[in-house]
């Protein structure tokens, strides 16, 4: 059992390292009132997939290369293939600002992620991830820019911010690769309760437990401000503002002589008096036609942001 709060407990049913870049976890949350399980499951799934932050390579400078359609002397892969391999490298670490990793390898050699030199706070999850093959005695030299963020960012997002000699990479910042959930009824209860079964797979940079902790904290922070909102002050302010508007005289609308005289004839002196009339009521006033209604409506909205009743 991972924890129990207000009678609701979360239990890890299964945890398994499938390989260095995939960790599986299965959790049960119970008891939940009828209908709550799908609400909790859907909210957790969305946050797990989109908001849990990750660390990844966002751009690279390759010595002697100035665009992605080039080839590197002595290297089997072209630049596009190298960028794709770099995109798949899984990193982890507490990155507070952009960091730079460096790679310099002389061939013949098979180049892997474990040969990249990163700052101490960044770790390569799988040092055996393939990057390229150098067939001759040539060098492959790179600088790699690393960021921490969430979600998925396309090349276009970084291209304007990156130096011209850095090649941007489509970046995946999502440590959680997949989330499934389903709901089961708790049958041995007189009251309708449910249990939520949650399964998730991470890329190895975070454990499933860490991912759930982060997602839960994120949801709490999202909803917590709603607990202290004071709607009474806002309602009071709106009421006072409306009262002040109603006290204004219709002279402030700067109406045409025809529309103004028609309203004064039926003793409409203030905005409050005018708002007592619907559009249909105004059309019944003698000599007050559709054009006058449109004029009054536009003036009311432009001056005070209010509309006539239909």
Swiss-Prot record:
InterPro entries recorded: DNA-dir_RNA_pol_insert, DNA-dir_RNA_pol_RpoA/D/Rpb3, DNA-dir_RpoA, RBP11-like, RNAP_asu_C, RNApol_insert_sf
Any one annotated GO CC term: mitochondrion
Primary location: plastid
Catalytically driven reaction(s): RNA(n) + a ribonucleoside 5'-triphosphate = RNA(n+1) + diphosphate
GO molecular function: DNA binding; DNA-directed RNA polymerase activity; protein dimerization activity
Ranges where the record places region Alpha C-terminal domain (alpha-CTD): 242-310
Pfam families: RNA_pol_A_bac, RNA_pol_A_CTD, RNA_pol_L
Alphabetically ordered keywords of this record: Chloroplast, DNA-directed RNA polymerase, Nucleotidyltransferase, Plastid, Transcription, Transferase
GO BP of this protein: DNA-templated transcription
Enzyme Commission code(s) on record: 2.7.7.6
Subcellular localization, as worded in the UniProt entry: Plastid, Chloroplast
Region listing for Alpha N-terminal domain (alpha-NTD), in residue ranges: 1-230
Subunit organization: In plastids the minimal PEP RNA polymerase catalytic core is composed of four subunits: alpha, beta, beta', and beta''. When a (nuclear-encoded) sigma factor is associated with the core the holoenzyme is formed, which can initiate transcription.
Role noted for this protein: DNA-dependent RNA polymerase catalyzes the transcription of DNA into RNA using the four ribonucleoside triphosphates as substrates.
Family, per entry: Belongs to the RNA polymerase alpha chain family.
Domain notes: The N-terminal domain is essential for RNAP assembly and basal transcription, whereas the C-terminal domain is involved in interaction with transcriptional regulators and with upstream promoter elements.
Annotated HAMAP family: RNApol_bact_RpoA (MF_00059)
Stated name of the protein: DNA-directed RNA polymerase subunit alpha
Source organism per UniProt: Cyanidium caldarium (Red alga)
UniProt lineage: Eukaryota, Rhodophyta, Bangiophyceae, Cyanidiales, Cyanidiaceae
């Amino acid at each position: 059992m991972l924890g129990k709060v207000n009678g609701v407990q979360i239990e890890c049913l299964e945890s398994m390292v499938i390989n260095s870049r995939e960790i599986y976890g299965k959790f049960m949350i119970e008891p939940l009132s009828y209908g709550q399980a799908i609400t909790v499951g859907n909210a957790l799934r969305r946050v797990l997939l989109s908001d849990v932050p990750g660390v990844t390579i966002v751009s690279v400078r390759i010595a002697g290369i100035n665009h992605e359609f080039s080839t590197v002397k002595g290297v089997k892969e072209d630049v596009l293939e190298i960028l794709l391999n770099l995109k798949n490298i899984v990193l982890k670490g507490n990155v507070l600002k952009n960091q730079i990793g460096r790679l310099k390898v002389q061939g013949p050699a098979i180049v892997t992620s474990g040969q990249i030199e990163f700052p101490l706070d960044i770790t390569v999850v799988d040092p055996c991830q393939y990057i390229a093959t150098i067939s001759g005695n040539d060098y492959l030299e790179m600088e790699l820019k690393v960021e921490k963020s969430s979600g998925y960012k396309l090349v276009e997002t970084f291209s304007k911010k990156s130096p011209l000699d850095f090649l941007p990479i489509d970046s995946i910042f999502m440590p959680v690769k997949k989330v499934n959930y389903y709901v089961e009824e708790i049958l041995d209860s007189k009251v309708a309760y449910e249990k939520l079964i949650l399964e998730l797979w991470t890329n190895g940079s975070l454990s499933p437990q860490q991912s759930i902790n982060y997602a839960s904290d994120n949801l709490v922070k999202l909803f917590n401000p709603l607990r202290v909102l004071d709607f009474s002050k806002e309602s009071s302010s709106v009421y006072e503002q409306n009262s002040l508007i109603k006290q204004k005289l219709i002279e402030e609308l700067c109406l045409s002589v025809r529309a103004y005289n028609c309203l004064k004839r039926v003793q409409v002196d203030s905005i409050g008096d005018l708002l007592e009339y619907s559009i249909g009521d105004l059309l019944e006033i003698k000599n007050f036609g559709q054009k006058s209604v449109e004029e009054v409506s536009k003036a009311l909205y432009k001056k005070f942001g209010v509309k006539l009743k239909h």
